[in-house]
């Protein structure tokens, strides 16, 4: 994933040079208002939300204990079903990166099943105080020695 900004040509060239297989690239808007809609499409959010509503309707009229437990469990969810990717590498930083992370959390991307990695984060301590993504991986250095 990378933003559609003035660095996109460089990112696209480097990705092409890597000659990666079994990957998809996703270019997104730097505008946070547009970004969430793009991430919703990427994650199939609308369909997963509909899946949940349909499943809940299956149990709403039932009175047996197992159906009630199932409905109670479903009420705790935001969507039903996973996304069609197992990892994401985000080539971004700063507030734009935070917007992407927030959109991934909003669209109910399961952090237990999807590895989220960024390449430009070690220098921005503010990301440590964000609570939208708990399992974020990034390359690092010995920060004390760097300073």
PLM-predicted stretches and their roles:
Residues 1-25:
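Extracytoplasmic ligand/sensor domains, especially the bilobed periplasmic-binding protein
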Residues 3-4, 93-95, 121-122, 141:
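Solvent-exposed coil/turn segments that connect beta secondary-structure elements
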Residues 6-10, 34-37, 41, 95, ...:
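Extracytoplasmic/secreted proteins, especially bacterial periplasmic and envelope-associated proteins
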Residues 16-29, 35-72, 83-87, 101-147:
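Extracellular/periplasmic periplasmic-binding protein-like sensory domains
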Residues 89-91:
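Structural motif
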